Amino acid sequence: MVERKASVERNTLETQVKCSINLDGSGKARFDIGVPFLEHMLDQIARHGLIDLDIECKGDTHIDDHHTVEDVGITLGMAFAQAIGDKKGIFRYGHAYVALDEALSRVVIDFSGRPGLQMHVPYTRASVGGFDVDLFQEFFQGFVNHALVTLHIDNLRGHNTHHQIETVFKAFGRALRMAITLDERMAGQMPSTKGCL
C-alpha cells in the first residue's frame, strides 16, 4: 500500500506553520502551537481519527489567536489534500455522532473536491479558558478550503461550551476516519460516477 503521508510548511508574515500527517497512523500527536485549547482539540482529531499529527506553529499570538488558529486549519487542510492523493479506493463519505455528558454533536464530511462548510454550534459562552470559541469557525473554514471537502457540523444539544466543542472535534476525527478508510471492494476505483473528484 502506498504511504498516505504528507509534510507541509506554510509561511506568512503572521505565522509559520509546519504540519506532518499519516492518515494510516495510530493516533500519535505532538503539538507546539502556543494555543493550549486548540492543541487539546487537535489531539481529539488524532486520537479519534487514528491519524498521526505533528504540528508546529509560530504565530502572532501577542495580538490574538486568530491568525494561528486559521492558519493551522489551512495547513492541516493542505496536508490532507496532499496525503489523500487521487482519492481512489476511499469511502469518501464519513459521519459520526459523539456525546459527552449533556452535549451531542454530529459531523458529516464528503471528500468531494468542492469546499463547503455548514457549521451550526450555538455556543453558550464566548470563550473557554481565555480562548475565543468563534475562532473554530475560522479553523474549519481554512481546513475545508484547502482539503477541498464539504463539511457539515451540528451541535445538537449541550450547555457546557467545552463539551460542545469537544464533541465536535471528536466527531470530526471519527468522520474523517470513516471517509479516508480504504474500501477493498473499491480498490483502484474512484468513489464517484463522474470518474473524478
Swiss-Prot record:
<dbReference type="Pfam" id="PF00475">
    <property type="entry name" value="IGPD"/>
</dbReference>
<dbReference type="InterPro" id="IPR038494">
    <property type="entry name" value="IGPD_sf"/>
</dbReference>
<comment type="similarity">
    <text>Belongs to the imidazoleglycerol-phosphate dehydratase family.</text>
</comment>
<keyword id="KW-0963">Cytoplasm</keyword>
<dbReference type="GO" id="GO:0005737">
    <property type="term" value="C:cytoplasm"/>
</dbReference>
<dbReference type="GO" id="GO:0004424">
    <property type="term" value="F:imidazoleglycerol-phosphate dehydratase activity"/>
</dbReference>
<keyword id="KW-0456">Lyase</keyword>
<comment type="pathway">
    <text>Amino-acid biosynthesis; L-histidine biosynthesis; L-histidine from 5-phospho-alpha-D-ribose 1-diphosphate: step 6/9.</text>
</comment>
<keyword id="KW-0368">Histidine biosynthesis</keyword>
<keyword id="KW-0028">Amino-acid biosynthesis</keyword>
<protein>
    <recommendedName>
        <fullName>Imidazoleglycerol-phosphate dehydratase</fullName>
        <ecNumber>4.2.1.19</ecNumber>
    </recommendedName>
</protein>
<dbReference type="InterPro" id="IPR020568">
    <property type="entry name" value="Ribosomal_Su5_D2-typ_SF"/>
</dbReference>
<dbReference type="InterPro" id="IPR000807">
    <property type="entry name" value="ImidazoleglycerolP_deHydtase"/>
</dbReference>
<dbReference type="InterPro" id="IPR020565">
    <property type="entry name" value="ImidazoleglycerP_deHydtase_CS"/>
</dbReference>
<dbReference type="GO" id="GO:0000105">
    <property type="term" value="P:L-histidine biosynthetic process"/>
</dbReference>
